[in-house]
Amino acid sequence: MKTNITYISAIAFHSVLGLLLYLNESLGKPYFFIALFYFLYRIITASDKSRTLEVLKACAYFVGAEVLLRTTKGSISYEAGKYLVILFVLMGMFYKGISGKGYPYFIYLLFLIPSIFVASTTLSFDANFRTNIAFVLSGPVCLGLSALFCYDKRISYNQISQIMLFMVLPIIAHTAYIYFYTPNLKDVISSTASNRAAAGGWGANQVSAILGLGMFLMAIRLFTKSATLPLKILNASILGLITLRAITTMSRGGVITAIAAIVIYLFYYYRHSKVRKRNEIISIFGLLCVSLMLTWFVSVSQTGGLVGLRYANKDHLGREKESLTTGRSELFEGELEGFISSPFFGIGSSRAKDERIEQEGQGVTSHSEFSRTLAEHGIFGVIILLILIFKPLEIRGRNRGNYYFYPLMAFWFLTINHMSMRLAMPAFIYALALLNVKNEKRPLYRKQLKEQKV
């Protein structure tokens, strides 16, 4: 009961926080620093046994808050979310060390370096070398260090639920902020293009991605942490509210990623559950479907049917659009051409964007981390991708009972292919898949036998 009250209080607090940030965006800076010092204090003062958990909670919270802090200008820098995750995992390494079995991720980090030297000779004179390199490599470095720290770290299912809760709480605050920012969607949506106003005044792609993460986390919570009917209704309602605003950003990537990850999660969760638990899963699945269907109908109603046209790949007049990928396929092909032209050392970090500026007059950032990695890192990029894809399968082979592995890997893979690594989120999600998740051992209670006097 006490846990449920604490959970509801945390939701209420973050909902109010979203309102306060809407009323006064200057509160974003104090919010950022209070959260930062709070988690630093928790990590430093934690016992050795709980320090890994505290590090992961800190990372999770700032992953969930990253887009909200960008929206409200609360971060000290645009890439602060990635830098803080790097800071926290480095602290974790200092206190807890790393597994020797994770050495391929050290190789992965080393293979990022040659592209910097190549970029020093290929980037145009007008390009800002330091900021361009930092923007492109901060995500991959964040992933590599997070993976090094998390690889084979033993953690319980209850602890990973806590980590996911810390990740979704700031997303709840962000959702509240968006509702107050745009209370009436009909006022701002007039086409099927991605809508910045409906996304709370920030890039719809990033907002859709982070709200998609919220959908995924709340769906998991609905199945694993909803012991009572009121909690089931509460979690299903929050899921519906997040989903509604994710859909109405008119950016499809985050929503599709979330739904795919939820389906994969349910498959493995159901498969690893006992017969009695499976009956409960089926009933909750019905509640999930009702919540999502109701949300869809509300979104269609509030947008005058434009959401339906968007997901059917049509414009506001109902005409079929030429491309389903909204220009991403052209970017992908261009980056593959870069790989073919420089297959050994690549074209250099950030050069793909730089080339688009020279050729088209505008530097559209890559949406696919795979094609960007191949183009900018060459043969080293091929090895990097092989490490990222195949190394996790080793830990999966040693822990087949972890039903979070494939959903997390799927979420990472789909995210980096629709928005690259603009956020710290895909890096941290990937690292979570490398944790060695086990059931908690129940303490054995033995009766003490007293010697009887004769």
Residue ranges and their predicted role:
Residues 1-95, 115-121, 411-413:
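N-terminal signal-anchor transmembrane segment
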Residues 19-32, 71-79, 131-135, 201-208, ...:
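Helix-loop-helix junctions and helix-breaking kinks within/between transmembrane helices
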Residues 42, 405-414, 420-454:
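Transmembrane alpha-helices of multi-pass inner-membrane enzymes
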Residues 77-91, 102-121, 125-152, 165-168, ...:
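Aromatic-anchored transmembrane helix interface
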Residues 145-146, 159-189, 202-271:
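Alpha-helical transmembrane segments of multi-pass inner-membrane proteins
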Residues 195-197, 277-284, 294-330, 354-357:
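Flexible juxtamembrane loops connecting transmembrane helices in multi-pass membrane enzymes
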Residues 263, 375-415:
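Hydrophobic transmembrane alpha-helices and their immediate junctions
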Residues 313-377:
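Long extracytoplasmic/lumenal interhelical loops at the membrane interface
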